[in-house]
């Protein structure tokens, strides 16, 4: 049996402000740093150790990983950083407040933009300074692979090659792997691992800073999965994620 641990980055500044973040490179809040520290301490307390870790090129995920590994007394752990683990790109929605956007367009439309499997928001214009082609960290990525917007289907297509070429072979080689990434890149992995339907993935919400453990058989099929930590706290955090895209009630 193999084990894989997934963790969504701790609360970011734009999580706090309830804004669509996507590929915008915002940092963790103090709460987010504390979540990452507690995640690392929990993993250490439960006896987890890692041979290899992976994360995205966005600082909120990188810093979460650093802080968690520090709490594990394991900052020597080799880390693979790859853009394919980035958050889903939200196109023109990036930077907008989710509740204000819901008040303008309706809760249902925002839910579609946030969670529909195959519907993407309007793309960024090629000349928009937020377009990833203007960001030096993507300079070596072919321009036709850089998204101006994505739906979850696109995110799955981006993430799975990295799973197949890097993460899965490492697990099969017996390496204990930790992945610190984002809500939607992790939803992409979960959809693949659990064979979640296009309809059911809409209801999957991943809380920030909570380690999710997958026990996998020799074919990397899930035997079971579970969050570490307090069940009530995790349920409340999931509900909070689900409510982010709803208009505020007066």
Swiss-Prot record:
One GO BP? gluconeogenesis
Active site annotated at which positions?
A: 9, 87
Q: What is its EC number?
A: 5.4.2.11
> Does the UniProt entry include the keyword Isomerase?
yes
* Catalytic activity, as annotated: (2R)-2-phosphoglycerate = (2R)-3-phosphoglycerate
- Where is the site described as Transition state stabilizer found in this chain? 182
Q: Which UniProt keywords apply?
A: Gluconeogenesis, Glycolysis, Isomerase
Q: In which pathway does it act?
A: Carbohydrate degradation; glycolysis; pyruvate from D-glyceraldehyde 3-phosphate: step 3/5
What Gene Ontology terms describe what this protein does at the molecular function level?
phosphoglycerate mutase activity
This protein's superkingdom? Bacteria
Its top-level enzyme class, in one word, is: isomerase
The record's listing under Pfam families reads: His_Phos_1 (PF00300)
How does this polypeptide assemble, per the annotation? Answer: Homodimer.
Q: What does this protein do?
A: Catalyzes the interconversion of 2-phosphoglycerate and 3-phosphoglycerate.
Q: NCBIfam families annotated for this entry?
A: pgm_1 (TIGR01258), PRK14115.1 (NF010713)
The family annotation for this protein states: Belongs to the phosphoglycerate mutase family. BPG-dependent PGAM subfamily.
Record protein name field: 2,3-bisphosphoglycerate-dependent phosphoglycerate mutase
